[in-house]
Amino acid sequence: MGDLELLLPGEAAVLVQGLRSFPLRDVGSGGWNQQHESLEKLNMQAILDATARQDEPIQELLVTHGKIPTLVEELIAVEMWKQRVFPVLCRLEDFKPQNTFPIYMVVHHEASIINLLETVFFHKEVCESAEDTILDLVDYCHRKLTLLVAQSGCGGPPEEEESQHSTPMQELQKQAERMDFEIALKALSVLRYITDCVDSLSLSTLSRMLSTHNLPCLLVELLEHSPWSRCRRGKLQRFEGGHWQTVASSEQQKLSKLDGQVWIALYNLLLSPEARARYCLTSFAKGQLLKLQAFLTDTLLDQLPNLADLKGFLAHLALAETQPLKKDLVLEQIPEIRERLEQENRGKWQAIAKHQLRHVFSPSEQDLRLQARRPS
């Protein structure tokens, strides 16, 4: 790990080997919190490794020990907890937390995992080691990007300023909304890295991306709405590095990292032979994709020269006949994690919330002091 060491030699391997999936009922428990702490350490070390452009042992360890599927499962589990258990918990009469830190830890867990996945998915072998859970991850990314498009039509995430009149729980809910926005942006990067592997993805995964979710058209919507850009007091701002930053006039034509991720994903999905053979260019898809022509300026092509090929593809598409929507007669795999979690916990959301209220989210002062010392 060179000079930049957060974890001692051998410590990272122990942490990776210990990663496991938890039942939803155990979210926030002692063992779960220890794993959250481990993930934070692995996260920081992975970022240090990537920044130093040296060997990246965290990514190698996750692949070697087959832990990418575990991370995907934990990601979807905490997403489901936030959607199914958290709202029930907030409605319980007895739920009057003196301290919201233990709940913040759970809400933050999804951000921790997607951040780690974004760091390591840059490497194609990580994508391959996800095995069948790549379908679940594609679905997860699609859910996040759909919410991002929807959110861009109603003002984006709440502002960062705290209100003097907010209760701790109201502040936590605002924090969770802001975090969801950042999580969606990370999911965009993960999806782009998955499209880098389009030539080695299974037919089921390609079909999921191109037919079930029609990701090329969703990506066009993202470019149109650009939810990571906004105008405030006549000045352009972009969401970068975890907060909104005003863009200098001289930098406004410069391609943002997030716009770049969308363009690269579109390039991969529309120009790779494997994807082109699977994508049905209906009249709707043609209409959506031709909107890209207006964005393909000389300034953009100077920054991403490969997009000249995409420009040529669109010129050809403008003259091409559209295809009727067809259903491939392929025996397809389907994502299993979310459906399994739904089945295992159906009708139990209230019981899980009550259990966690008693055993997890009513900590003693000593518990709170211990948790506050951990990285978050």
Functional labels for PLM-detected ranges:
Residues 2-375:
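Extended alpha-helical interaction scaffolds used for oligomerization/partner binding
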